Amino acid sequence: MTHSTQQLSPEGVAEGKRGRLIRELVNRDKTPLIILIMAAVVGVVTGLLGVAFDRGVDWVQQQRLLALANVADYALLVWPLAFIMSALLAMMGYFLVSRFAPEAGGSGIPEIEGAMEEMRPVRWWRVIPVKFIGGLGTLGAGMVLGREGPMVQMGGNSGRMIVDIFRLRSPEARHSLLATGAAAGLSAAFNAPLAGILFVIEEMRSQFRYSLVSIKAVFIGVITSTIVYRYFNGERAIIEVGKLSDAPLNTLWLYLLLGIIFGAVGVIFNALIFRTQDMFVRFHGGDWRKLVLIGGLLGGMCGLLALLHGNAVGGGFALIPIAAAGNFSIGMLLFIFIARVITTLLCFGSGAPGGIFAPMLALGTILGTAFGLSCAHFFPQYGIEAGTFAIAGMGALFAASVRAPLTGIVLVLEMTDNYQLILPMIVTCLGATLIAQFMGGKPLYSAILARTLAKQEQARATVIAQEPAVENTPQIGK
């Protein structure tokens, strides 16, 4: 009798079981490796685009201000030059958008959300250069716009570009890399990797497909884009307000009151954005020449305002630490708030290529600081530091408007490096979100996407109605 099989030892049996378990686990995970590799590539490309865009905007702004500084002693030159330079830069952005890629106008985030549902096209070969150069123009002109919207849209389009270049055919790859690019773009814009992940999972929850592949891809893309950003810009917080004191427990009711105020402000702010967008559509009526002219006037106005009151224009990041430090009186803070609300509505509502994150965060900081100073005056026994309310307000307006409280909380904490304020942030953002929902307000980006899709269907119906009717005439001889 030949011994074809040998008796296994207990150690061998256990090792065999472990091997089978590992093989079953590996076989159960069907994540295509190519998607994860491409997610890393998307993150690198998006990070490089973000760094280039950020530095490009800074360079354009510096050159514009340098030219004005050279003629600062000549009033007859500095005022016309300020208007003309900003007007021309803005007109370049509006022209590129209106003539080559209308979907590159505005924030671009709703376009990515629509693309994730296969409802909006992704023409990356047009959108990336138009958004990049157009954004350099409008943001370089000093308009009240943010850099994060362009970065999110360029990131999402970079994901689709990688899909097309490497001919990835699966719907899973198309969706995962689009979401990866969007998350990587936000991460690179704010040096906030966790907020980038949460933004896609929370804000884009209606469009994002919660699968292991998509989640892994988003994580990898955010990691690589953040590494690229920090390689070029360092690891410091993007908004330096210093370490603020903890919020005492007996002051949490004030943060809840602040959240209630911001809930109402967020609903009103969104409604004003929609009305401003409709107003500009009535002004230009779809004529690109009128749109470019309007953009030039808005850009020139921002150029003049920069000379009169620089805090009323620009993205607002430079204003945030100044306001949070309590360098303005309550009256001046309210004046700046009203002025920036008007300029934000005009610049963003006109369809200029640029985001609204940064202006919104600045508005929240200003109003939050004013509230904090008021509380310090009326409740001196609490020893209130107004800067803590500035930080809470920064996230509260975002939470009320965008309806993504978790993203708002994490985003602000990552940007300011004040993680000890997480409890008042939660109270404020939750209060703002609940009040906004109670008042019937619509999330900003979802509402903009719905309006865009409605216009798309209306245009399609108009084209179909204008097509000549084909009559079925009987054929003779058959």
Curated annotation (Swiss-Prot):
Q: Which UniProt keywords apply?
A: Antiport, Cell inner membrane, Cell membrane, Chloride, Ion transport, Membrane, Transmembrane, Transmembrane helix, Transport
Question: Membrane side Cytoplasmic: which residues?
Answer: 1-32, 117-123, 167-176, 202-214, 282-287, 439-478
Report the residue ranges where the short sequence motif Selectivity filter part_1 is annotated in this entry.
106-110
Entries under SUPFAM superfamilies matching the protein: Clc chloride channel
CC terms in the record's Gene Ontology section:
plasma membrane
Per UniProt, the short sequence motif Selectivity filter part_3 occupies residue numbers 355-359
Taxonomically, the superkingdom here is Bacteria
Which GO molecular function annotations are given, in alphabetical order?
antiporter activity; voltage-gated chloride channel activity
Positions binding chloride in this chain are S107, I356, F357, Y445
Q: Where in the cell is it found?
A: Cell inner membrane
Q: Which reaction does this chain catalyze?
A: 2 chloride(in) + H(+)(out) = 2 chloride(out) + H(+)(in)
Question: Which CDD domains does the record cross-reference, listed alphabetically?
Answer: EriC (cd01031)
Which residues are intramembrane?
109-116, 177-189, 193-201, 387-401, 402-404, 405-416, 417-421
Q: Site (Mediates proton transfer from the outer aqueous phase to the interior of the protein): give the residues.
A: E148
Presence of keyword Cell inner membrane: yes
Q: Its topology with respect to the membrane?
A: Multi-pass membrane protein
| Gene3D superfamilies for this protein | Clc chloride channel
Stretches that traverse the bilayer: 33-69, 77-100, 124-141, 148-166, 215-232, 253-281, 288-309, 330-349, 355-376, 422-438
Primary location group: membrane
Cited InterPro entries:
Cl-channel_ClcA, Cl-channel_core, ClC
Cite a single Pfam family from the UniProt record: Voltage_CLC
- Quote the function comment for this protein: Proton-coupled chloride transporter. Functions as antiport system and exchanges two chloride ions for 1 proton. Probably acts as an electrical shunt for an outwardly-directed proton pump that is linked to amino acid decarboxylation, as part of the extreme acid resistance (XAR) response.
* Assigned protein family: Belongs to the chloride channel (TC 2.A.49) family. ClcA subfamily.
PANTHER family, per database record: CHLORIDE CHANNEL PROTEIN (PTHR45711:SF6)
Assembly description = Homodimer.
What name appears for this protein in its UniProt entry? H(+)/Cl(-) exchange transporter ClcA
Q: What is the species listed in this Swiss-Prot or TrEMBL entry? A: Yersinia pestis
Gene behind the chain? clcA
